[in-house]
């Protein structure tokens, strides 16, 4: 048998087993299989860089589901792939070329630049794939996809043409969200909003004859250069006499009308607003209804154009200052008020978004909104957690046409050709070559230079990756997919649009369930500077604080979204190097609550590294003790002996208990995974292996295994049961921690090589032997409940646990060293069932606590000083030597003195009115928390002293 090293070497084991799985093609799906199917398409990571912790979480959760279903007997397909990420990738490559070659994108032809992007894509994609493999992801790598590969490109062109032919795609002049930095339009969902402190400027606009002025309020002085009207409410009596008259627009000397419109809020500003149809969404609608001129004053790169008069060439920000300054010089600036303004920001470049009149391609959404609502309302698509439904419906209620064209070079070129002489003559073509008309007269036609929104191709991902528009065997077998797992931040960007496209193309939503994970937050630490600023701590300090080093009083902390500037990013690959893949996966699984925010504590990785060590050591103990011990090798369990099965007549309380708890845990973990409660599944598996199996059952079994008590038959029965529980436990944990469990599975399989179940063997032995006949843990059957949960046995064992807990608690309170053995008295009534159980199971209790002897009595013993604990009607006493009592009193008195000094200092500080007035609120709050904590600790010390004689 392979000798288990004392230490668990994660890196060595990780590399070994991933290569094994890959070589055996365990991840490759068979579309001709008769098994039930389970399919997931990966949310394709962008080919812009490396994976972050959000990717690690989403992909770990998907891999857990795939591995679980594979072990349950499903034909599983997990489709991997990457996304071309139009804007993001183009920006990254542009920056790279400026840095490495000193050239801008416009210094290249389109074809030259795209060659550089494809080179970047290949390198980045290879790096991402290797990182996904390091996470242990069991994707079907034979079906690796890219959103711009040949089949996906065909799918995109086919979908565009289908929508175009059905009249659902149109091109028109429309006010779009314009990013001046990337010089492209953005969809509404790609704009983030921030509240920024700004101003409300009050200007005087003169009437045509300058007989009087009308006062208007605006947050965008620079756009007045494009004003084509001013508007008032038709119900506002103050201005009814002005409706129909004309204003002479200051600075531009242009006559514009005063109009009445119900959209005007009489309570805002002066009740009169400027109308700039080409640069404001609300004004755009007013401009359409009143047939106003649309004057664009901005160039694509965010500067004032020729329509802005002498302000031409200024940026929008510069123009704002210049307009305000000139209005002030002319005596037309009345006043300026502070105003909180909601500003749109590009989700990619972080540039301020400008409303911009532009010719773009759109998908009509009116016809889709009803269906999008219905599929969620009628349960065809479940959003999990369900609280996301209200957010989803709110988005549908405010749905506007989807702008799908982008002014970029990298992406799916819009499959439209225009006739050079007549732009209204156009061809929509889905083929991979050129339309016949273009082939025959190439000089007469030109293709649209824009590309499609990245999310257009991503919306086809669940079926384009399966071969659509071709009717492939994969599409027939695996569509619709089984579930989509992704972050809630792309519910509208991606999830809703996949539902839309899947239902439109295939008359069926692409998945019945969507599990939306929360966003990962990290702990930020900072110091308050004297000028009121914030200085984040360095990386070493952050790591120390994350791992539990006490935080100084001057350092503050809170959970925030991970960002480089805050220094709270946790790199998943660094965590893998430090703690091992299985530890990282289990930490992520245990953190994957159904909350909107997931606070990721770095100590969780250390916690689960300790757990993987516990799995290793627990399994090592079991396997070593199958060969007996150094004194007696005849205790060895043979394959033939194991085949005989368990002898239920020899079962002790702990045997029945561990099987009951095993059945309960197996059933519970399956239920949790079925309901996407990954944190609960991880905690159940963790508690079972560490607490129930190792801390209790293995410890209780040791005296029998070591030959100190029991018969040879009882010892053999214990060995068999240890194997059975270990075999189920490592398979139970495998989807969460696949590497260590695969290693242990093969060692156990080798140890019991040739084992065959006899027909009369018990179901536990048969199930174990069947599992060990599998070629890998990856494809072994996942545990399901095969026995009963024995509540009576669990109740009796719970009593033993409470007695053990009470004894350990007393020892801990009295600071008894682990090597100090004491007597234990358990006192109660002879007719009390709990007293009787305690007397019956003295041997079990002795195996779990360090004692000289355990005495179960009906009368209190006559002893000197003893510490006492109570559980129900039982009294548990530990006699203690007088010397130990003196030491404990001295220690507690010193601790009390120390706490009283700290308490006095805190009280003096908080009673100092000058300190309270000057200190920031978060500092006084922290001091108050310390005060409460110190008072609580002092109370506990005094209570302990009162119990001592």
Curated annotation (Swiss-Prot):
<dbReference type="InterPro" id="IPR013155">
    <property type="entry name" value="M/V/L/I-tRNA-synth_anticd-bd"/>
</dbReference>
<dbReference type="GO" id="GO:0005524">
    <property type="term" value="F:ATP binding"/>
</dbReference>
<keyword id="KW-0067">ATP-binding</keyword>
<dbReference type="GO" id="GO:0004832">
    <property type="term" value="F:valine-tRNA ligase activity"/>
</dbReference>
<dbReference type="GO" id="GO:0005829">
    <property type="term" value="C:cytosol"/>
</dbReference>
<keyword id="KW-0175">Coiled coil</keyword>
<dbReference type="InterPro" id="IPR002303">
    <property type="entry name" value="Valyl-tRNA_ligase"/>
</dbReference>
<dbReference type="InterPro" id="IPR009080">
    <property type="entry name" value="tRNAsynth_Ia_anticodon-bd"/>
</dbReference>
<dbReference type="InterPro" id="IPR037118">
    <property type="entry name" value="Val-tRNA_synth_C_sf"/>
</dbReference>
<dbReference type="GO" id="GO:0006438">
    <property type="term" value="P:valyl-tRNA aminoacylation"/>
</dbReference>
<dbReference type="InterPro" id="IPR010978">
    <property type="entry name" value="tRNA-bd_arm"/>
</dbReference>
<dbReference type="InterPro" id="IPR009008">
    <property type="entry name" value="Val/Leu/Ile-tRNA-synth_edit"/>
</dbReference>
<feature type="binding site">
    <location>
        <position position="564"/>
    </location>
    <ligand>
        <name>ATP</name>
    </ligand>
</feature>
<protein>
    <recommendedName>
        <fullName>Valine--tRNA ligase</fullName>
        <ecNumber>6.1.1.9</ecNumber>
    </recommendedName>
</protein>
<comment type="function">
    <text>Catalyzes the attachment of valine to tRNA(Val). As ValRS can inadvertently accommodate and process structurally similar amino acids such as threonine, to avoid such errors, it has a 'posttransfer' editing activity that hydrolyzes mischarged Thr-tRNA(Val) in a tRNA-dependent manner.</text>
</comment>
<dbReference type="InterPro" id="IPR014729">
    <property type="entry name" value="Rossmann-like_a/b/a_fold"/>
</dbReference>
<dbReference type="Pfam" id="PF10458">
    <property type="entry name" value="Val_tRNA-synt_C"/>
</dbReference>
<feature type="coiled-coil region">
    <location>
        <begin position="882"/>
        <end position="949"/>
    </location>
</feature>
<dbReference type="InterPro" id="IPR033705">
    <property type="entry name" value="Anticodon_Ia_Val"/>
</dbReference>
<dbReference type="GO" id="GO:0002161">
    <property type="term" value="F:aminoacyl-tRNA deacylase activity"/>
</dbReference>
<keyword id="KW-0547">Nucleotide-binding</keyword>
<feature type="short sequence motif" description="'KMSKS' region">
    <location>
        <begin position="561"/>
        <end position="565"/>
    </location>
</feature>
<keyword id="KW-0436">Ligase</keyword>
<comment type="subunit">
    <text>Monomer.</text>
</comment>
<keyword id="KW-0963">Cytoplasm</keyword>
<keyword id="KW-0030">Aminoacyl-tRNA synthetase</keyword>
<comment type="similarity">
    <text>Belongs to the class-I aminoacyl-tRNA synthetase family. ValS type 1 subfamily.</text>
</comment>
<dbReference type="InterPro" id="IPR001412">
    <property type="entry name" value="aa-tRNA-synth_I_CS"/>
</dbReference>
<keyword id="KW-0648">Protein biosynthesis</keyword>
<dbReference type="InterPro" id="IPR019499">
    <property type="entry name" value="Val-tRNA_synth_tRNA-bd"/>
</dbReference>
<dbReference type="Pfam" id="PF00133">
    <property type="entry name" value="tRNA-synt_1"/>
</dbReference>
<dbReference type="Pfam" id="PF08264">
    <property type="entry name" value="Anticodon_1"/>
</dbReference>
<dbReference type="InterPro" id="IPR002300">
    <property type="entry name" value="aa-tRNA-synth_Ia"/>
</dbReference>
<feature type="short sequence motif" description="'HIGH' region">
    <location>
        <begin position="45"/>
        <end position="55"/>
    </location>
</feature>
